[in-house]
């Protein structure tokens, strides 16, 4: 799920660069609710264009590494831009990780978790995992 947040944050960094090519690294920080406040134009940016914008930014500034940060919250209503499948374990109820999963499977998390409970799957960090493909 950390990699999911990273990949989705990269999309939003690239979309920011497409809207503001002169952005500084500080401008590229992804705020908690930024994805939900995107303009319609930015929201329809293809993932490959967003990622290409990051590569172009690095090339333009002769950089090999981009230093920025993210506070992205992925919750129901979030539209995934890069991630098409996810391998994850079964998370604790009322956690932000469960919100991320719920957003990915469009609310079907209860059906998935009920199946896991009925079949004695193990939960949390050292438990069983699942491959989710919406």
Locate predicted features.
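Surface-exposed, charge/polar-rich loops and edge strands
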Residues: 1-134
């Amino acid at each position: 799920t950390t990699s999911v947040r990273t990949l989705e944050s990269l999309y939003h960094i690239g979309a920011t660069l497409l809207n503001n090519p002169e952005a500084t690294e500080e401008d590229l920080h992804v705020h908690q609710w930024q994805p939900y406040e995107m303009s319609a134009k930015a929201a329809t940016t293809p993932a490959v264009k967003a990622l290409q914008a990051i590569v172009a930014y690095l090339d333009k500034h002769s950089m090999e590494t981009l230093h920025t940060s993210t506070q992205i919250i992925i919750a129901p209503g979030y539209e995934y831009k890069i991630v098409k499948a996810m391998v994850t374990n079964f998370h604790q109820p009322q956690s932000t990780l469960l919100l991320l999963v719920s957003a990915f499977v469009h609310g079907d998390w209860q059906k998935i978790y009920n199946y896991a409970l009925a079949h004695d799957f193990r939960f949390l960090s050292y438990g069983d995992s699942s491959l989710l493909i919406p």
